[in-house]
From Swiss-Prot:
PROSITE patterns recorded: PCMT (PS01279)
One matching Pfam family: PCMT
One GO cellular component, as annotated: cytoplasm
Record organism: Chlorobium phaeobacteroides (strain BS1)
BP GO annotations: methylation; protein modification process; protein repair
Keyword annotations from UniProtKB, A to Z: Cytoplasm, Methyltransferase, S-adenosyl-L-methionine, Transferase
Name of this chain's protein: Protein-L-isoaspartate O-methyltransferase
Catalytic activity: [protein]-L-isoaspartate + S-adenosyl-L-methionine = [protein]-L-isoaspartate alpha-methyl ester + S-adenosyl-L-homocysteine
């Protein structure tokens, strides 16, 4: 009985979250459907699940966060508008929530995580949910070359510049969505591949954890 009551509460909270996303300007029906379907609280430790549907980032340990729902929805909307289907690479698996959203939307999802504890935790969660997300432990700034090219690449951490390895792994007309900037804030930036050239578009400012790796920031 308690589990059924909790399920209803979480379902109501998800609905409230989706309504808030609409008020914030998220209008894509596929994105909203995914956010209403994927149970965000399952990506939180049990002690913190009451915070899962709040509109804020939340620590998942190791200096990393699960991004606030609006940020995830914003990046997902940018992807689906430019790349409605295909093979997508996520840099920074973190909790696994973004990968689950992409999988629900029908993408073939590949994701890279550099922190072993988060890699193992997200693998367990995604596996328990029966999702066929392809995961690897490694330096996300180098992408996943063996599985390239990708129709889209989403980076869930802030970088000083777009890693050349990621640009090189885009398919023709593929898009790289990445926050670019410094520790004070990053502009959400989209790079679209046109042959050996990349069209650059800049959008709103966000605050992400740093992208650590050979082509990102150094670990302090």
């Amino acid at each position: 009985m308690a589990e059924q009551q909790d399920a209803r509460v979480y379902s109501d909270r998800r609905h409230e979250m989706v309504e808030q996303l609409k008020r914030y300007g998220i209008t894509n029906s596929k994105v909203l459907e995914a956010f209403n379907a994927v149970e965000r609280h399952l990506f939180f430790d049990a002690a913190y699940r009451d915070f899962a549907y709040d509109d804020g980032a939340f620590s998942i340990g190791y200096g990393q966060t699960i991004s606030q729902p609006y940020t995830v929805a914003y990046m997902t909307s940018m992807l689906v508008e430019r790349c409605p289907s295909g093979k997508v690479l996520e840099i920074g698996t973190g909790s696994g929530y973004q990968a689950a959203i992409l999988e629900y939307m029908g993408y073939s999802v590949y994701t890279v995580e550099r922190i072993e504890a988060l890699f193992r935790r997200s693998s367990l969660i995604l596996g328990a949910l029966g999702l066929t997300v392809h995961q690897i432990l490694g330096d996300g700034t180098l992408g996943w070359e063996e599985e390239a090219p990708y129709s889209g690449i989403i980076v869930t951490a802030g970088a000083p510049e777009p890693p050349s390895a990621l640009l090189g792994q885009l398919a023709e007309e593929g898009v790289l969505i990445i926050p670019i900037g410094d520790s004070t804030g990053q502009r959400m930036t989209v790079f679209t591949r046109r042959g050996e050239m990349f069209q650059r578009e800049e959008f709103h400012t966000f605050a992400f954890v740093p992208l650590i790796g050979r082509e990102g920031w150094r670990e302090e």
